[in-house]
């Protein structure tokens, strides 16, 4: 299979840093089992701190986005170093860069590309260009819920849903401000929709179960299916 793994920037926050070795080991396991893997890293708390400081300096949204992009690329570089020779040795800075490096046959790890675009949008673009079998979103919730599970105790996990159903759930919760992107931003959803990309949403703490999920040996998270 060809997989795009979108890793929440929270994975790289200090309190979750012990999970980085898990992430590295899962990627190695996937490669050893014959999968081709692209990874997109978010910026996490470090990006939000820089964006917050930038706002206090009255920076515009494009400049704030660039700060977030630079942090996401630093996270990508950290993961890249940990994978040694199975990963392409440089972090791409555009979709064209990514495409050239994907041709190497190695794992390619990237952060953000340009202002106004979330790393979820980057992950959707990457999935489209490699014709991924799955876009895997490793985030801080257990899947897609009927509403925000961190705010509503009666939120219900949806094991399977369509892109249209996902759009309805996310409608009204999207923000285009730097550092405020939701699970999938509008651009990411459009790309997923037009290219009929299958999306798997799981908690990043369950990432070690991904190989079994892909084999059909375990059911976890939410699958967003094309229409």
Swiss-Prot record:
Regulation: Inhibited by UTP.
Protein name as it appears in the record: Uridylate kinase
Lineage: Archaea, Thermoproteota, Thermoprotei, Sulfolobales, Sulfolobaceae
Residues binding UMP, per UniProt: 43, 65, 113-119
Subunit and interaction comment: Homohexamer.
Gene that this polypeptide is encoded by: pyrH
GO BP terms in the entry: 'de novo' CTP biosynthetic process; UDP biosynthetic process
Ranges that cross the membrane: none
Iron recorded as keyword: no
PANTHER family, A to Z: URIDYLATE KINASE, URIDYLATE KINASE PUMPKIN, CHLOROPLASTIC
The UniProt record lists the keyword ATP-binding: yes
Pathway: Pyrimidine metabolism; CTP biosynthesis via de novo pathway; UDP from UMP (UMPK route): step 1/1
CC annotations in GO: cytoplasm
Organism whose genome encodes this protein: Sulfolobus acidocaldarius (strain ATCC 33909 / DSM 639 / JCM 8929 / NBRC 15157 / NCIMB 11770)
Enzyme Commission no: 2.7.4.22
Any one GO molecular-function label of the UniProt entry: ATP binding
